[in-house]
């Protein structure tokens, strides 16, 4: 949990490029991707490292979205921000345990 908290703190120092406010990469709306990731990660952190089944499902889908988006980014898209999201999401999804509800 400490690693994700550290990465999230690092992410908060990243700049959101204004050009992403209406951008899609690989057909994925980046504002919505960022918002969904933020909601799931902050909930995971607030809950001491656990997510309900619905949010875990969302996070798994967002991990797949990130893996499609990352190769499409250029430097003006601040790929460092998206790599941080990817690392946090992967760590949370890989951590388990998975909820039964």
Regions found by a protein language model. Give the residues of each.
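Amphipathic alpha-helical binding modules
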Residues: 74-101
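Exposed alpha-helical structural elements
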Residues: 3-7, 54, 58, 65, ...
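Amphipathic alpha-helical interaction modules
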Residues: 13-63
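Intrinsically disordered, low-complexity regions enriched in Ser/Pro/Gly/Gln/His and often acidic
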Residues: 9, 37, 75-78
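Secondary-structure edge/capping motif, primarily at the C-terminal ends of alpha-helices
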Residues: 44-51, 66-74, 96-100
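Short, hydrophobic/amphipathic alpha-helical patches that form generic packing surfaces
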Residues: 33-44, 68, 84-91
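Hydrophobic alpha-helical segments that drive targeting, anchoring, or assembly
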Residues: 59-83
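Short, extreme N-terminal segment that most often corresponds to the first beta-strand
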Residues: 1-16
């Amino acid at each position: 949990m400490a690693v994700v908290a550290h990465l999230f703190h690092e992410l908060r120092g990243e700049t959101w490029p204004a050009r992403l406010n209406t951008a899609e990469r690989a057909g994925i709306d980046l504002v919505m991707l960022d918002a969904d990731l933020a909601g799931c990660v902050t909930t995971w952190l607030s809950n001491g490292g656990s997510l309900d089944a619905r949010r875990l499902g969302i996070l798994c889908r967002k991990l797949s979205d990130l893996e499609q988006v990352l190769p499409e980014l250029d430097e003006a898209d601040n790929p460092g921000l998206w790599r941080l999201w990817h690392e946090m999401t992967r760590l949370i999804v890989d951590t388990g345990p998975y909820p039964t509800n």
